[in-house]
């Protein structure tokens, strides 16, 4: 039995930046530092930051006056930003720049009076933040959430002739493609973004897991259950006909999965650290794996800048 590692896998530039913002804020300002929502969707990462002095909350009313709060990589609504400013909270914004790009698109369309269709999963914090970029004060446009092709058939928009779409950044490209095609059939004049809103890291990791699926008879994806992009990776492998499981760490591996398998593929979602992948590799070796190789994959060199204040503090 051998193991084939996907490449790329694990942390993306947005996740790296978000985690580093929390760490540096704690180092420079001292604990506690409040973080609205899990900064990234990974239990190991969140637990580590808690030990360093981060306090995770769901709403700003849980943050004391005069405290420092960090917005998670998933982004927040305009209402949250306004509330933080009203209360005079010190804010560091760890929103992924690729999510911020989507926010700007929504705001631009709304100011122009267009309606916007957001393709995404209800209840996901990124979707809540993007939906919250629209308000009556910012423009006459409206925003609608569509989760699947079936909802396209019943969608009723205010002005079909002035419509645009955008997507949650962590979805499956295949899923969004079908929804977009269905929307274009109903609304031929619909505008789209200049570039696909599915982020580069999501696309690269999905391409890599498909490479695994072509060569393996089992694919393990390291990631937490609430990680959208990690779930999509496991779904894609299963869709390509390969047995696949999403696991938080090595302890969740069922030895029965390995029985009879010759080639095991291993990848990690964009919010899962390499240390968890290393733990899974160690466990697979205990279960009989005797060789590890790695796909060539798509090189990634993207780096997102930290907030200026944290960069300056580090230099000083």
From Swiss-Prot:
The gene is ispH. Catalyzes the conversion of 1-hydroxy-2-methyl-2-(E)-butenyl 4-diphosphate (HMBPP) into a mixture of isopentenyl diphosphate (IPP) and dimethylallyl diphosphate (DMAPP). Acts in the terminal step of the DOXP/MEP pathway for isoprenoid precursor biosynthesis. Dimethylallyl diphosphate binds at residues 41, 74, 124, 227-229, 271. Pathway: Isoprenoid biosynthesis; dimethylallyl diphosphate biosynthesis; dimethylallyl diphosphate from (2E)-4-hydroxy-3-methylbutenyl diphosphate: step 1/1; Isoprenoid biosynthesis; isopentenyl diphosphate biosynthesis via DXP pathway; isopentenyl diphosphate from 1-deoxy-D-xylulose 5-phosphate: step 6/6. Keywords: 4Fe-4S, Iron, Iron-sulfur, Isoprene biosynthesis, Metal-binding, Oxidoreductase. It is an enzyme of class 1 (oxidoreductase). GO terms for molecular function: 4 iron, 4 sulfur cluster binding; 4-hydroxy-3-methylbut-2-enyl diphosphate reductase activity; metal ion binding. Its EC number is 1.17.7.4. Isopentenyl diphosphate binds at residues 41, 74, 124, 227-229, 271. One of its GO terms (biological process) is terpenoid biosynthetic process. (2E)-4-hydroxy-3-methylbut-2-enyl diphosphate binds at residues 41, 74, 124, 169, 227-229, 271. Binds 1 [4Fe-4S] cluster per subunit. This is 4-hydroxy-3-methylbut-2-enyl diphosphate reductase. The lineage of its organism: Bacteria, Pseudomonadati, Pseudomonadota, Gammaproteobacteria, Lysobacterales. It comes from Xanthomonas campestris pv. campestris (strain ATCC 33913 / DSM 3586 / NCPPB 528 / LMG 568 / P 25). It catalyses: isopentenyl diphosphate + 2 oxidized [2Fe-2S]-[ferredoxin] + H2O = (2E)-4-hydroxy-3-methylbut-2-enyl diphosphate + 2 reduced [2Fe-2S]-[ferredoxin] + 2 H(+); dimethylallyl diphosphate + 2 oxidized [2Fe-2S]-[ferredoxin] + H2O = (2E)-4-hydroxy-3-methylbut-2-enyl diphosphate + 2 reduced [2Fe-2S]-[ferredoxin] + 2 H(+). Its cofactor is [4Fe-4S] cluster. It comes from the Bacteria. One of its GO terms (cellular component) is cytosol.
